[in-house]
Amino acid sequence: GGCGKSQQYQKSTDFPKGMKTELTEQIKVNAEFQYPENCKNGKCAETQISGQTLWDKQEEIAQLLVQDGNITNEYIDDYGTVQYKIYEIAENNATLVISDDTLNYATDQASYINNVLFSDSHFDDYNGNKYQDKTDLPFMPQKEAWKNVSEVLDKLGVDVSDDVICYVMEHSIMCEEEKKAIARAEEEDTKIPTAKTQWTEDDDCYYFMTYTTWQDYPVLPPVMGEGFDENNVSVIYDKNGIQSLSINGYYPLELKNEVEVVSPEMVLKALEKYFGNIISDDIYEVQRISLCQKVVQVNPDKHSAEIEPVWECRVLVKNSDSPDSSYLQKIYFHA
């Protein structure tokens, strides 16, 4: 957005940290404003793709995640316009799949873990809270496990936020949750997950979730919105190391130039106009406005993408008739 008239921009040296106000009877603001430290003078970074994508680094990634000599098969698969490099690893029955902007590595053990964690609180089967009573497991403190994971991400050149969610996956809880998941699948007549049945302390692990960043800007993958988890990086770590590493939507960025940025107050005006045009009795509560780098167009043929700075607005929509059915909505404005 640098093409708007300059008087639209607030030339203040600092944006506020947040705001609490009522714009209208239906639009309430109790919001935190998030933006990088270096965005103080009403300017923000405009970025472009730089350096090596995950696809370019496939050999390094394979060496980092798989011990030498263990790759039993490797091939390239085309899916539509996207190419995937696939490595099969016999030793722990793992696969590693790499495209331009995604990396998915998982062992057999990881699939058992994934079968017993339901981390989306929108759904009835949510059980993430069960894994958050403890901080540490006997095999290693959580902090140390995250430090080890961070070192691997650093070697991959992937920057992530310190804003990390950790599920402490303790074997006795996983055993119980597996029984429930199987019972639920039988009841609903859906595919029954392969059961591990025997869970021991060797299965204890940490399940970390976070998101990619660039110089403190969250970097948002192209597909976002309802039902999409903003955490595009997840890692399962146990006493044998990384059992699963998933990065969905990673783009190596560099600074293109500094651009004037619309203030959070201007964004609130835009939100007021946006919701003012919707005919509804819902109540909108603006909770957070964050300055992000958003991937808007991906060109798989050229292994490239377009990036632009955006304000992401997180709004709680409360239904006036049934307050229980409130939901979060994310709305994006050009910065």
Question: Predicted regions: what is each one?
Answer:
Residues 3-224:
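Preferential activation on post-signal-peptide N-terminal prodomains/segments
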Residues 148, 152-234, 239-323:
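Segments that shape or occlude catalytic/ligand-binding pockets
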Residues 322-335:
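C-terminal soluble interaction/assembly domains
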Residues 134-141, 304-309, 326-329:
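Glycine-rich, flexible loop segments associated with nucleotide phosphate handling
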